Structures are given as C-alpha cells and as structure tokens.
C-alpha cells in the first residue's frame, strides 16, 4: 500500500518503512507524528482519491531526527563598483520513518501499521 501525502507545501509518495525528509517539524526525535492531509491512497486493489484530501485517513510516522540539506551558494557581483558578495544556506529538515498507513476511527488509532 502506498499513499501521497502533503506536508510543508510539498507532496511525497510514501509506503510503510520509507524514510523521508520533510520541512522542519517542531518535534523531538522518537516522537510519533500523523499526516492528516492524504491526497491519494492505493492498496493494490482499491484506489482512493481525495477532493482534496481523503477524510478520516492518516499516515503515521516516527521522527528519526533532524538533518541539513545540501548547501546552496549565491553570488552577487557588481563589476563597476568592484563589489562581490557570496553567501550560503543549508535548509534544516526533519527525517521521518513511515510506520503505518490507515484509516482513523472514533476512539481508536485505526488500522495503524497495516
């Protein structure tokens, strides 16, 4: 089974056991997270398409830690003034391991892990 989730303004195709890097979340390593905005789900026989999201459907994950992305450098140069400025940036990401995909039921976690 796989699903397409939206978090941090980006979309990710995930299945159980995947490790993904998402925009920085304010959580500690080892914390459980739920992604509620599931846009698409496929379990091999049944396809669910959200409009825009699938109601009562969640993707569960566990925070592994925070990582930094690749360094992006920029350069600004003004030849007539003999002026040059160089700077760089490394974006912080949260690494999440997907632990389950399933529906959410009242009072229960749903079929978490299946």
Swiss-Prot record:
An example GO BP is: translation
The record, for InterPro entries, names: bL21-like, bL21-like_sf, Ribosomal_bL21
Q: One Pfam family, please name it.
A: Ribosomal_L21p
Is S-adenosyl-L-methionine one of the keywords?
no
Membrane spanning segments where?
Answer: none
Write the record's keywords in alphabetical order, separated by commas. Ribonucleoprotein, Ribosomal protein, RNA-binding, rRNA-binding
Query: Which cellular component terms (GO) are annotated to the entry?
Result: cytoplasm; ribonucleoprotein complex; ribosome
**What's the superkingdom here?**
Bacteria
- GO MF term set: rRNA binding; structural constituent of ribosome
What is the documented function of this protein? Answer: This protein binds to 23S rRNA in the presence of protein L20.
Under NCBIfam families, the record lists: L21
According to the record's subunit comment, the protein's assembly and interactions are: Part of the 50S ribosomal subunit. Contacts protein L20.
Question: Family, per the entry?
Answer: Belongs to the bacterial ribosomal protein bL21 family.
**What is this protein's record name?**
Large ribosomal subunit protein bL21
Organism name: Protochlamydia amoebophila (strain UWE25)
